[in-house]
């Protein structure tokens, strides 16, 4: 269905197009008015009327009409359907111009087709022309001008009409936008003419008021020509002018207007009109400056003033004649004090006179120096300075400029003596820019002033200050610097009052003609960095890069991730302390300097705050050290006060054998061997061996010979308890038995024990082995004997033992190896070794229990008994079943004593790696 509809629409469109092409001459309708021109601000209504033929062909009526302006549909509120063939549209307060209004229909209710279109024009009717005037240029047609009034936005025609009383002249037509019209004829002088203007457009037409005039009163003469200027040698202040007037001068009387100016000036000077009111062709201008070039121009008008001034003539110039200078040059001096004391080098300087004051070409200058009442010295100088050597006295210098006519008035300058002290400076000196000039203002001193000398120079660190100067009259207290001044440069301005007796004290200040932002910013650095603060410092910017007065500095600092902080610092400061910073933190900082015209940033600088504040580590370390020192001191004092107790536990008193009374216990018992302990001790360079008992872990069974001696050890222990002592308790490791060396010399050198073994008093004969040589040496120890050795009960025990019948058997303490197969061949044996039957394991257990009980019951000498018991147990141990050998090393040296030998403690002497006495 939709495809069929599309096909029908296309066929209908082709049909309508064919019909419309064939009937272009006859549209389906029309709009009236067809050429509307609407006055702006009014209402306008257009009506579209459809023809009956179109109604039938396109099956439409007036309700199918669509209005458009410039292809934009008009709102339905403005459309009115009059009947089935007509529809109207209304526009209120029309302001548009050149709008295309079209009437369209929707054929078959869908296809839009244009029926008719018109263009709507809007505008205003013409205003009455005003200010109508006419001018008659000499030798040309009359030109009239008018004011057409407001813009009409429509095509408007202006017609200029003129007539005599009996004759009309051709019209002059012009269109809107042109305010003048040239008449096509030359008017006749002395005959009045009437002129008016008519204006017309689609909305109406108007006429101006007519004007009536004589063309001679509207004439504009041609400008004067051939203007010339000449000077006079007699008078240097006049110039003579001559010219030729226009051709009307023969018909009309003309007066002239003369103006002049100096060559470099921009404004003209008017010659009074009353001086040129009469017709003339020459004139003399007076009161001019000598030797000055002037420019002149002239124009003319009718003598009665009616009509128009002619155009200005071509300019002509002339120069007045020379005259003597009207003013003395500005005069100043500088004294160089580096010469010997009797002379001064004075530099006299002066300014060139301007042309307006020189009144001619300056040929030279005359300088006269007078010292007190002496003869004057005259110098003729072509330049503007003179260097002379003066004494330390006062001088008076005069200066005059000379040209071809004569000399200028002389200017006098007093050069005071070398001991002169200047005073009375100006006060309240100010300098400020205004109107692109640098002004200087001051308050005069109370003393009368002849003149002021103003000096200025550019301050720079790269070049010297070369001053320029100017002179001002003594009545002046405000002036501007005359010279070529630069912007963004610092000027040092000095004002010196000059009195009749000499110059006063100079007063200086700095100023800028125009300031700018600095060329570079300050460079900041750290002076001191703490934990939470940092002292920043910087240098003042060089004057060459300041470009103005530094008002303030800004310091911007931030961390790598923090917000930037900004502080402002006065321009007089060169350092600033940043506080409330974070410890051990990297900061980035830069500075900017500001003038009144802007600022400039300096380079960025980084620093890191300290982790600890200054003195914080010392505050921690010093108290700790003091506390440690105090603790140590208290400990030392405590140890000193408790030295006896400490000595008792660490270094117990060891009896000195040399002072022992043991020899007095049995004084009647002679020694078995008479020998000198010092002379005969180990005379054969043989040393007592000190052996250490080593029990191999694999030995299970004790040796039979060792088990045999267990019973003897038990019996002997009872009788010897209380008669054995070593060096200092358990640490001395002394045995309750005398030890007999039984190992070879190489074995004794291997012992590294530090315990010194003393002999033990045994009250019985030696039962096992008696060494061939019994050697005792006197102990070199200075340690006292043990307390147990000095007790009286010990002495009684010794006596009772000596008198007893039973003598305890002596036990030998030696290294023994059981005879087992495979024993190490390098193990040393004693020459005599007792063979005992193998004991049972029960005997060994009983022996250990006995040792434990003895150790608990004996507080004194327990270590010696333990060591002795370990030696006895070692003797009792035999060879295990697996054939391994148990090795015993002797830890002491046995001393063989006979039953009738006197009991005494004698230290054992060990050499070459053995035990040395303490």
From Swiss-Prot:
Membrane topology per record: Single-pass type I membrane protein
Compositional bias annotation for Polar residues: 773-785
Subcellular locations according to the entry: Cell membrane
UniProt signal peptide: 1-22
Residues listed as glycosylation sites in the UniProt record: 43, 61, 83, 131, 157, 205, 226, 382, 389, 477, 552
Topology Cytoplasmic: residue spans: 641-918
CDD domains found in the cross-reference section: FN3 (cd00063)
Entry GO MF terms: ciliary neurotrophic factor receptor activity; ciliary neurotrophic factor receptor binding; coreceptor activity; cytokine binding; cytokine receptor activity; growth factor binding; identical protein binding; interleukin-27 receptor activity
Domain Fibronectin type-III: 125-215, 223-323, 328-418, 422-516, 518-612
Expressed in which tissues: Found in hepatocytes, astrocytes, fibroblasts and endothelial cells.
Bilayer-crossing regions: 619-640
Residue intervals annotated with topology Extracellular: 23-618
Record-listed Phosphoserine modification sites: 660, 666, 781, 788, 828, 838
Entry-linked SMART domains: FN3
One Gene Ontology cellular component annotation held by this UniProt entry: dendrite
This protein's record includes keyword Transmembrane: yes
UniProt keywords, alphabetically: Cell membrane, Disulfide bond, Glycoprotein, Immunoglobulin domain, Membrane, Phosphoprotein, Receptor, Repeat, Signal, Transmembrane, Transmembrane helix
One Gene Ontology biological process: cell surface receptor signaling pathway via STAT
Motif WSXWS motif, chain ranges: 309-313
PANTHER family reported for this sequence: CYTOKINE RECEPTOR (PTHR23036), FIBRONECTIN TYPE-III DOMAIN-CONTAINING PROTEIN (PTHR23036:SF151)
Subunit details: Component of a hexamer of two molecules each of IL6, IL6R and IL6ST; associates with the complex IL6:IL6R but does not interact with IL6. Forms heterodimers composed of LIFR and IL6ST (type I OSM receptor) which are activated by LIF and OSM. Also forms heterodimers composed of OSMR and IL6ST (type II receptor) which are activated by OSM but not by LIF. Interacts with HCK. Interacts with INPP5D/SHIP1. Interacts with SRC and YES.
Family: Belongs to the type I cytokine receptor family. Type 2 subfamily.
Function in brief: Signal-transducing molecule. The receptor systems for IL6, LIF, OSM, CNTF, IL11, CTF1 and BSF3 can utilize IL6ST for initiating signal transmission. Binding of IL6 to IL6R induces IL6ST homodimerization and formation of a high-affinity receptor complex, which activates the intracellular JAK-MAPK and JAK-STAT3 signaling pathways. That causes phosphorylation of IL6ST tyrosine residues which in turn activates STAT3.
Name of the protein in its database record: Interleukin-6 receptor subunit beta
Organism: Rattus norvegicus
Higher taxonomy: Eukaryota, Metazoa, Chordata, Craniata, Vertebrata
Gene assigned in the entry: Il6st
